[in-house]
Regions:
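Interfacial segments of multi-pass membrane proteins
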Residues: 8, 45-80, 91-102
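Hydrophobic, aromatic-rich alpha-helical transmembrane segments
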Residues: 15-16, 44, 57, 61, ...
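Hydrophobic alpha-helical transmembrane segments
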Residues: 19-24, 48, 61-66, 86, ...
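Alpha-helical transmembrane segments of multi-pass membrane proteins
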Residues: 25-30, 68-75, 116-123
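Alpha-helical membrane-embedded segments
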Residues: 102-123
Length: 143
């Protein structure tokens, strides 16, 4: 996800609405790979990190995403992983709304955030349906 977005920043302004497609393409490609007939997917979380790393020097979106992943993996541990991922991306999207209003001020980056987050959540929908209530655990780690 990093390389296409980083290269595209030399040709398309990240504040251009066309840039949304550039950012969404690697995530969709990893979620629904052509090679596997659009059925088996994976690594769209990694691709989403790469996509937002490609926005160098604007690293705030990927830093916020990394913060939420670390928070729900180390401080407030949520298991199973699919639930942790969904909660992480929801928190990331909400935080990015406020970051866009007060700091970033780029609607295309916000829309990319929401679309990428929705794609990741949608891909984890099946795993969420298979989770039984007794499997869900929230553990708060103290320093």
């Amino acid at each position: 996800g990093f390389l296409p977005v980083y290269i595209a920043t030399f040709f398309v302004n990240p504040d251009d609405y066309l840039f949304i497609l550039v950012m969404l393409a690697p995530v969709v490609g990893h979620a629904y790979p052509l090679y596997y007939g659009f059925k088996k997917g994976g690594k769209c979380i990694a691709a989403s990190f790469g996509v937002f790393l490609g926005l160098i020097p604007n690293l705030l979106p990927v830093l916020i995403l990394a913060f939420w992943f670390i928070f729900f993996s180390v401080v407030l541990i949520i298991n199973p992983h699919a639930l942790r991922t969904v909660v992480t991306y929801i928190c990331w999207m909400v935080t990015m709304i406020f970051a866009t209003i007060f700091i970033i001020k780029s609607i295309p980056i916000l829309l990319s955030t929401i679309l990428v987050g929705a794609m990741v959540i949608f891909r984890h929908n099946k795993a969420l349906k298979e989770i039984e209530e007794k499997e869900i655990k929230f553990v708060f780690k103290r320093g």
